[in-house]
Swiss-Prot record:
The gene is hemC. The modification S-(dipyrrolylmethanemethyl)cysteine is found at residue 249. It comes from the Bacteria. This is Porphobilinogen deaminase. Coiled coil: none annotated. GO terms for biological process: protoporphyrinogen IX biosynthetic process. PROSITE patterns: PORPHOBILINOGEN_DEAM (PS00533). Tetrapolymerization of the monopyrrole PBG into the hydroxymethylbilane pre-uroporphyrinogen in several discrete steps. Its cofactor is dipyrromethane. Its EC number is 2.5.1.61. Binds 1 dipyrromethane group covalently.
Amino acid sequence: MQTASFKNGTLKIGTRGSKLALAQAYLTRRLLQEAHGLPEDAIEILPMSTAGDRIQDRPLSEVGGKGLFTEEIEQALKDGRIDIAVHSTKDMPTVLPEGLHLSVFLEREDPRDAFIGRSARRFMDLPQGATVGSSSLRRQALIRRLRPDIEVVMYRGNVDTRLRKLDAGEVDGTFLACAGLRRLGLADVITDLLDPSVFPPAPGQGAIGIESRIGDERIDVLLAPLAHRETQIALACERAFLGALDGSCRTPIAGLATVEGDRLSFRGMILTPDGRQAHEVTAEGVVSDAAALGTDAANRVRAMAGPHFFDGWQ
């Protein structure tokens, strides 16, 4: 593990090169500048291409899962070529490379899924036989659960690509994270926001996570003011739930925690890819037990589903 390049005078932020990833990196830079009175040239953003960005013709579940979006960036972090990495937390595996951790979560944006419709504004108002594009197994399963009459097609690409395909009439509607659209200034394209009690989001959705080297005390001090208490607590629960279920891009898993004062509420769900089977679990407790609540919820929902629920489709 290399020493921090920030010792040479510039903090280096690693990120994917998409518009959304860059918007999140620029937000992180601005927050660091405001927290520490740093000039703009004290922080450099280094866009990187990842395997997940390059492979666009197949579902992520077929080619390696969430790690495809992080491997190259994490190697740069381990090598000392960058000091921190900025990620969409929902894209992060629960097991990180040795020596790295998600040290800080920024204040969460709206975690809900957004529907962008062409033939109907509301998802539930789509005509029978309509076509919806999504590459997320969770969204595909939820769509099939709620509207088994709808055809779901694989739909990859960045936000611009997906919206362009929609405008071209390739599908009648698509789903994107509300948070990403808002960060890109595209909230006006949203035609429907899905109720998380009916269409629960992915664990970590809407939250930006900052990955750093374990034991890099100077970086820890720099990042500390950016940590958002409620988001940190909620994601401790959600990621514990995901991790206990061995969640990846190959598993339709949903989960959302909310924090009020010293109390936490959590709702999680696991589904079969066809949406025909779904098992839901809820949990409540004190915030200090966030991770334990997530793990316990995962154990309970796994027991509900039975030992063969995951067979044949992981």
